């Protein structure tokens, strides 16, 4: 079971911060897109950062080169003087101190600017990402695990932060340092430069060899880590079941088995990875020692004009050459990993937004002369569909709540149709109830009314208007929906009710709560309507959460209600309380109701019985009971279960 829920976890690996390099399509295109996001708002900052990096790198090289002058022109001559004059030496030390200070100041300024650039870019990217996510169709969220979407906001954005703030600046700095140091070393001594390059080649060869040996073990480590995380998540979600059946020891044994396997794979992987740094460090020290011995021999033999100052300057450059070489490999891998995260970010941003070809809008109206509908900005409680025409004229059609399905076919995927030839209607003020077995298509029909999905064939009309012509926002504003899975947001009770209509007053929210019969329990909460709700309203019972969801729908005062199994998870006493409130809420409104407890739909104007996506019966409760068909079986079976 844990294996089925295991998630891919990106963790550290042998290549600096991440094991085997992920495969990325079009890395150049991705990198350009990232840099375009950065340069769009921070191009002057980036130019200043580049200047700081160049100044810092050249200051370090210049400081190393100054050692030759310091030793050959100041220290060595002073050793031959009977009474050394320290004045020139002090001046030289001040100059080298200034060089170091300039390098440090440039590095500090670079770091400060990059913090601003990085955080600003990520802020803009998160806003774009969230804005686009809000425009995606429900189908996207149905087909993508929520954990994967969250991972884009957390893991992938964080790897991008590391790349922008650290990896790219260090790569640029390393490249400038390598070029400037290599040029300086060649000008000083080509012989010692050859020795240095041979040791660097050996260093890179050893690193690549060790990395290739550890790669397969890091793949195993990532898989085992995913299994452990999946098992922990599964046990957390099923903790009540574990305790009810007293399977704590069994759960612990299962965890130990997976944890031991993770330990072994991680140990094998890190046995190799942990020796990369010591090996490269020792090879760097070896390069330093070899150059020191060779340089000393050349200086003693006066080969190629080698002096003590030249040897010391070259050794300083040698030390500064090995470090950026190793950094390039590490930071290049970090960039590749960040590009893998960026690929997922941009893939989400490139998803097609929810299409909306509608042009009919919902507006407030009032009656003018001769009972003509006139659009107004006032909240009159009278709504109308504003229908612009090709000839430039506009007509207003009063919203009534008349919904009709004509020969509707639908499938969540093209190759599988789940609704077949659906014909039904809901007249203004009618209560239409959908019943049927699980998977019969009840919820699917309500999803089509609010255009969470678009139909494959047929027509759905709202007050005689094809709903494809109605803008989705306006269509959904005309609907009050209580979903099967109630979701409450972090905030006060009042704020959660007001979510149904953001401009609702406190009095209107309280009136909606009274209509939903939620006012009584809300007043008993510690702070009443100002009680804070967190963690999806975990401090409320399921029934109380359902009542608030109904109040949220009520405050919107919609002409059409969709109640998706609104009382399926409430106890009988609370159900009666809810039902009284719902009867008042549904009065005068077209209502589509789905309920497991068929006793709640007895008073429906029309009961529609669905089976395998087809309407097989319709009529009032008494009519369907008299037929002794599918509804009769469901109803009598439902009563027996209750």
Language model feature labels by segment:
Residues 77, 184-198, 268-343, 348-352, ...:
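Helix-loop-helix
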Residues 20-28, 51-52, 59-75, 99-146, ...:
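Juxtamembrane helix-loop junctions of ABC transporter transmembrane domains
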Residues 82-83, 365-642:
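ABC-type nucleotide-binding domain
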Residues 1-60, 75-96, 110-114, 118, ...:
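Membrane-integrated ABC transporters
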Residues 40-43, 138-139, 155-164, 168, ...:
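An intracellular "coupling" helix at the cytosolic face of ABC transporter transmembrane type-1 domains
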Residues 41, 45-58, 166-220, 293-306:
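Transmembrane helices of ABC transporter permease
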Residues 32, 51, 106, 110, ...:
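Hydrophobic alpha-helical transmembrane segments of ABC transporter permease domains
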Residues 13-22, 119, 127-151, 155-157, ...:
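Short intracellular "coupling" helices and adjacent cytoplasmic loop segments at the cytosolic face
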